């Protein structure tokens, strides 16, 4: 007898080995129809998987996260099937699931066109409607190599040839198409109903620029029509908010081919930058951080001690001078330890908090660069706290409270909290890990935060809290971090004198709130669709005259507001006022002030707020009070 334990702890017995599909059918016809796969003792499998011993089983449907993964994986195969039907000379390579969808790489004699993409998607819909069964078979490695060579699929043959000779490989077939795959997959193509092909791009075989260029077709797939439509609507909204597009329209910054992955800030963009930096500098000052500054170029011997030279060298920019090798720093932490080590530190000095607006460089691959969100040169609000194990809890509580205030001030209300715990490969004693993990968890509880545990996702040198922002259109951005580090103080021999007179290692807490300022400003631009809150807006108010006779009065108004510390633009051009209002509105300014003869005579201004709101005529003093209130409230 085979005993199956279901998620509700109920048990079912079967006289002999049984498939996942058969168990689903024995529970009910509805479940049998909805089943996409199963999870047997924690492992996701096909519905055809044969259970031969007592096991725990949950049936996977489209409502489950694993079900969506199965749908996307199988839709990637459906894409390859359709391409082979329409372009028989194309060779298939790989097709993994990615966030929100999948892609598949093809070798073909020419790039696919938008018309090709439409035809492929149409063929996918037709193949799905045929509801062809998806079946699995297993072959010895060499047999599988010979099979794919015989049908002209040389990329597949190359992939399989790299697998150890004594291993078998699994193949999945739907209709006339068969592909190498570990699986699992949905039971038939009819389960794949809600998908869309998004774009085609170039990609090198095996990610190596020395290899052939392939065609990468991206797609998305969802469990329901509504979810697909919501995702496509979100993408449309994201396109309108794209910081690269808004950066150009609002004249904030540009990226130049002369310096790929590095940002040229224009005056208005740099004003935003300075606003963020000055705000964060005040955060340092108000919360017991001492601001420091370290060099950008550091001898490789330091990076050898920290382990970066072994593990991270490919991502570092290096240079040589006088027969010494140097690297542009990819992170600030080693420099802060060198500062900590200057002079004897006592337990009375702890916790010691350093903060730096540290410029870092990382040699990101060109394909991964994205506007100002993913760059090669960036500045972090990088802080490091040197403390004892007993001080971790309070430092984390204080940090979380501070982070929440900062995010609220920038307009973010929705924060997701995750605690990443010890991985199998780690340094430090279990006792130290217990203390650190407990401190992180207790700090979030003390702050009233709901959080998730991510088992095994901590770094080898310590656990961490990840703080993720959810933006106006539901996207998630991981910005803040609180990382416990037992390793680097040891590697770089940081010490303090304890109450007992002996030397001890401090614990190092790496913390960032906004992270990369470049990336955070990109997130801000997209969150607010370019209409930044008044306190951050590069131009807070534009003063417009209607005719030349009000020009001098307009200058006086602008000067008065500038003297109050406001960022003011004065537009005295001889253009129609409607044209000027429209032009400044497109720049998403918080306020536009119009002055005509009536306003001049009354010593007043006509006020328009963002969103084409007419606030009527105000005295200059009343307007100044209103905008000052906006700034004070971070509105």
UniProtKB/Swiss-Prot annotation:
<dbReference type="Pfam" id="PF02824">
    <property type="entry name" value="TGS"/>
</dbReference>
<comment type="subunit">
    <text>Homodimer.</text>
</comment>
<dbReference type="GO" id="GO:0046872">
    <property type="term" value="F:metal ion binding"/>
</dbReference>
<keyword id="KW-0547">Nucleotide-binding</keyword>
<feature type="binding site">
    <location>
        <position position="510"/>
    </location>
    <ligand>
        <name>Zn(2+)</name>
    </ligand>
</feature>
<dbReference type="InterPro" id="IPR033728">
    <property type="entry name" value="ThrRS_core"/>
</dbReference>
<dbReference type="Pfam" id="PF00587">
    <property type="entry name" value="tRNA-synt_2b"/>
</dbReference>
<dbReference type="GO" id="GO:0005737">
    <property type="term" value="C:cytoplasm"/>
</dbReference>
<keyword id="KW-0862">Zinc</keyword>
<dbReference type="Pfam" id="PF07973">
    <property type="entry name" value="tRNA_SAD"/>
</dbReference>
<feature type="region of interest" description="Catalytic">
    <location>
        <begin position="242"/>
        <end position="533"/>
    </location>
</feature>
<feature type="binding site">
    <location>
        <position position="384"/>
    </location>
    <ligand>
        <name>Zn(2+)</name>
    </ligand>
</feature>
<dbReference type="InterPro" id="IPR002314">
    <property type="entry name" value="aa-tRNA-synt_IIb"/>
</dbReference>
<dbReference type="Pfam" id="PF03129">
    <property type="entry name" value="HGTP_anticodon"/>
</dbReference>
<dbReference type="InterPro" id="IPR004095">
    <property type="entry name" value="TGS"/>
</dbReference>
<protein>
    <recommendedName>
        <fullName>Threonine--tRNA ligase</fullName>
        <ecNumber>6.1.1.3</ecNumber>
    </recommendedName>
</protein>
<feature type="binding site">
    <location>
        <position position="333"/>
    </location>
    <ligand>
        <name>Zn(2+)</name>
    </ligand>
</feature>
<feature type="domain" description="TGS">
    <location>
        <begin position="1"/>
        <end position="61"/>
    </location>
</feature>
<dbReference type="InterPro" id="IPR047246">
    <property type="entry name" value="ThrRS_anticodon"/>
</dbReference>
<dbReference type="InterPro" id="IPR045864">
    <property type="entry name" value="aa-tRNA-synth_II/BPL/LPL"/>
</dbReference>
<comment type="function">
    <text>Catalyzes the attachment of threonine to tRNA(Thr) in a two-step reaction: L-threonine is first activated by ATP to form Thr-AMP and then transferred to the acceptor end of tRNA(Thr). Also edits incorrectly charged L-seryl-tRNA(Thr).</text>
</comment>
<dbReference type="GO" id="GO:0006435">
    <property type="term" value="P:threonyl-tRNA aminoacylation"/>
</dbReference>
<keyword id="KW-0479">Metal-binding</keyword>
<keyword id="KW-0963">Cytoplasm</keyword>
<keyword id="KW-0694">RNA-binding</keyword>
<dbReference type="InterPro" id="IPR012675">
    <property type="entry name" value="Beta-grasp_dom_sf"/>
</dbReference>
<dbReference type="InterPro" id="IPR036621">
    <property type="entry name" value="Anticodon-bd_dom_sf"/>
</dbReference>
<dbReference type="InterPro" id="IPR012947">
    <property type="entry name" value="tRNA_SAD"/>
</dbReference>
<dbReference type="InterPro" id="IPR018163">
    <property type="entry name" value="Thr/Ala-tRNA-synth_IIc_edit"/>
</dbReference>
<comment type="similarity">
    <text>Belongs to the class-II aminoacyl-tRNA synthetase family.</text>
</comment>
<dbReference type="InterPro" id="IPR002320">
    <property type="entry name" value="Thr-tRNA-ligase_IIa"/>
</dbReference>
<keyword id="KW-0648">Protein biosynthesis</keyword>
<keyword id="KW-0030">Aminoacyl-tRNA synthetase</keyword>
<dbReference type="InterPro" id="IPR012676">
    <property type="entry name" value="TGS-like"/>
</dbReference>
<keyword id="KW-0436">Ligase</keyword>
<dbReference type="InterPro" id="IPR006195">
    <property type="entry name" value="aa-tRNA-synth_II"/>
</dbReference>
<keyword id="KW-0820">tRNA-binding</keyword>
<keyword id="KW-0067">ATP-binding</keyword>
<dbReference type="InterPro" id="IPR004154">
    <property type="entry name" value="Anticodon-bd"/>
</dbReference>
<dbReference type="GO" id="GO:0004829">
    <property type="term" value="F:threonine-tRNA ligase activity"/>
</dbReference>
<dbReference type="GO" id="GO:0000049">
    <property type="term" value="F:tRNA binding"/>
</dbReference>
<dbReference type="GO" id="GO:0005524">
    <property type="term" value="F:ATP binding"/>
</dbReference>
